[in-house]
Structure formats: C-alpha cells, structure tokens
Amino acid sequence: MIKVGLTGGICSGKSTISSMIKEAGIPVIDADIIAREVLEKYPDILLRVRATFGGHFFDWRGDFRRREFGNHIFRFPKERIKYEEIIMPYIKEEIEIKLKEYEKINTKLVVVDGATLIENDMHKDMDMVVLVWVDKSSQIERMGFRDKLSKGEAINRINSQLSLERKKDYANIIIDNSGNLIKTKEQIDDLLEFFTLYQ
C-alpha cells in the first residue's frame, strides 16, 4: 500500500485540495479530525492539558475551550510544542490503526493529510510527500480575509510553523496554489492521474 503525505501551511489551501482528492474516491486520513477524536477517546489527554496549562482553558462545565487554547498555543510556540508532546503520540497511533485497516482491505493508496506532518516526523513513514505551496504574501492576505487577523497576527501564526520554503526540501511533489482555482485544478488532475499508476 502506498502512503502519501499531504501537507501545507496556514491558508495554503491544503483542505480544499484534500477535499478534491476525497471526491476522486481516494481514502484520506485527516490528522485534524483525528486530533479532535482522540480528545474524546482518551480522557487522559485533557487531564494532562489541565495539569500542564491550567484550568482556565476549561469552562464551568469542564468542557475544553478549544478556540482559546488554540489562540494561546499559536501565540507561544513553546506552549504549542508542549501540547504536541502530549497529543501527538495518540494521533500517530490512531493514524497507524487506520492505515492498518486500509491495508487489511487491500487498499492500494491512502493519503494522510496533516499540517504538521513534517514537523512531527510523520513524513518519514510516507512513501511520498505532496506539499501545497503558496507564497507568503498570499498566505498573509488569505489569513486576514478568513480569520480577520491583522498583518502582524497573521505573520506570527505563519512563523509558528515550519516555513513552506523549508517544507519544499521534504516534498516529492509540489502543488502551487498561489494562482487561480483553474490552475490548481489542473495540477490536481495531474496528481490524480499519477495516483492511478498505484491503484
């Protein structure tokens, strides 16, 4: 079974491309969805989050305030690393379980979609890595539009991840998503055609 890592950066358009791949009938394991699922499946994670970061990220019912916590770890990269040290082993384990399930039913190719695939060394378990690339000015502009952030806030969030330029060094295939949707679609069609070689 061929394992393809799909990664990108904030506002690079990775989610749109992931959706296009799914629509083509290719199985996609989404690390963001798994990150939400493991919080429910493994109560130990939130116990460790409370012990490490304090109770103020939980409301009066004890529910986790994800948005506030997300904003906090984006502002303080060392805090994000601490959180990833807690949650990543669970995410990796769940991805591995899902990959084995696909392998059991003789799936030929699976895509693992993860924004921090490279930062968390998951690219090493992939047969190839596809990077959704966009220039930094487009990233900043899209973030301001999507998330209503100031230019300074957008730059801080972008800088909290490994740069797309650095990620290029790890990629086998690069999708340039800085143009219009038609150009991106052409590249996706080429990618899907390439995938058929393995299916």
Swiss-Prot record:
Gene3D superfamilies: P-loop containing nucleotide triphosphate hydrolases
Keywords annotated in UniProt: ATP-binding, Coenzyme A biosynthesis, Cytoplasm, Kinase, Nucleotide-binding, Transferase
Signal peptide extent: none
Pathway where it operates: Cofactor biosynthesis; coenzyme A biosynthesis; CoA from (R)-pantothenate: step 5/5
One Pfam entry name: CoaE
EC number: 2.7.1.24
DPCK domain mapped to chain residues: 3-199
Keyword Transferase listed: yes
NCBIfam families: dephospho-CoA kinase
Family according to the record: Belongs to the CoaE family.
Name of this chain's protein: Dephospho-CoA kinase
The encoding gene: coaE
